[in-house]
A protein has these predicted regions:
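Gly/Ala-rich beta-loop-alpha elbow adjacent to hydrolase catalytic centers
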Residues: 157-162, 166
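N-terminal cap/lid segment of alpha/beta-hydrolase-fold proteins
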Residues: 27-58
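C-terminal catalytic histidine-bearing segment of alpha/beta-hydrolase fold enzymes
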Residues: 239-273
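The feature captures the conserved acid-bearing segment of alpha/beta-hydrolase catalytic domains
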Residues: 184-185, 189-244, 248-253
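Alpha/beta-hydrolase active-site loop
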Residues: 119-148
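Short, surface-exposed "cap/lid" segments of acyl-processing enzymes
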Residues: 47-50, 56-107, 111-114
Length: 273
């Protein structure tokens, strides 16, 4: 039997590990991580959403690394969406603050902004998480971050569902010199099939943009023990590209969807162009 739009992810996979953390606490955690590493908050108003961002302290440089957050706390239980998708563990922010180069962090719509239900209906962290207006807004924010930091080229780094966003944004741009994903959900159709979940009917899917992505060098880091976004999702994405495409995947032993990307990130960063 086909399941509903289940909460696949941190809480969907391990409900016992989801200790209560209210939204103000989640916001405070991210701000503490950012402040500790001298990242400054710079929220961005786009046509459709107000997006939370943090900009690193490095000197302005030609290349900006933009880290895009995952789906966050999208589900309260396996079948019930949360009231606010602000992450309980901001993995992409943990990675961004470890980057010694010019870096910025960009949250997803409705994360960290305490938005109303009118501004942020639940569909934007469930079925429509990769909707055209979401990608439009993220792309607009990336352009503004690029201007704020004086960059002329971009490396987009997406964690989990942020990997899909990074790919879809990269497909719309000509200034992305590398696409990087960490435990990235690069094919949500394959992902929902694997988990026997309802499709993300309002969302764009990265493989459909392969022609725009084929010329961009790509590196995808995958946890061998990741049961949330297993390697099969990457393989489904990769097969739409020609063999000659500059796409590299590294499958890391003893790593799952969450653990232990921050510990490994300084070493993995050295592999990037």
């Amino acid at each position: 039997m086909r399941l509903g739009l289940i909460g696949i992810g941190l809480c969907g996979a391990a409900l016992a590990g989801c200790a209560t953390m209210e939204v103000p606490q989640r916001v405070a955690l991210a701000e503490h991580i950012a402040t500790e590493h001298r990242f400054s908050r710079a929220d961005i108003q786009t046509e459709h959403f107000r997006l939370a961002a943090f900009i690193g302290p490095r000197e302005k440089a030609g290349v900006l690394h933009v880290y895009i957050e995952g789906d966050g706390f999208a589900w309260a239980t396996r079948y019930k969406p949360s009231r606010d998708p602000t992450p309980r563990e901001p993995v992409a922010l943990d990675l961004a603050v470890l980057d010694s180069r010019n870096a910025a962090y960009l949250a997803r719509p409705c994360q960290y902004v305490m938005a109303s239900e009118v501004e942020c209906p639940v569909r934007y962290w469930t079925s429509d998480r990769f909707a055209p207006e979401v990608i439009d807004s993220m792309n607009e924010a990336v352009t503004l971050l690029k201007g704020k930091t004086g960059a002329d080229r971009l490396v987009l780094v997406g964690y989990s569902g942020g990997g899909a966003v990074a790919a879809l944004v990269a497909a719309r741009r000509t200034d992305v010199i590398q696409l990087v994903t960490v435990a990235g959900n690069l094919d949500h159709r394959a992902w929902t099939r694997l988990h026997q979940a309802s499709e993300l009917t309002g969302s764009l899917n990265p493989p459909d943009s392969w022609r725009a992505l084929v010329g961009i060098p790509q590196t995808h880091f995958i946890g061998q023990d990741d049961t949330v976004v297993p390697v099969e999702v990457y393989r489904s994405y990769r097969k739409v590209f020609p063999e000659s495409a500059d796409i590299r995947a590294e499958i890391l032993p003893n790593v799952d969807h969450r653990c232990c990307w921050a510990d490994m990130w300084p070493t993995l960063l050295m592999q990037l162009r």
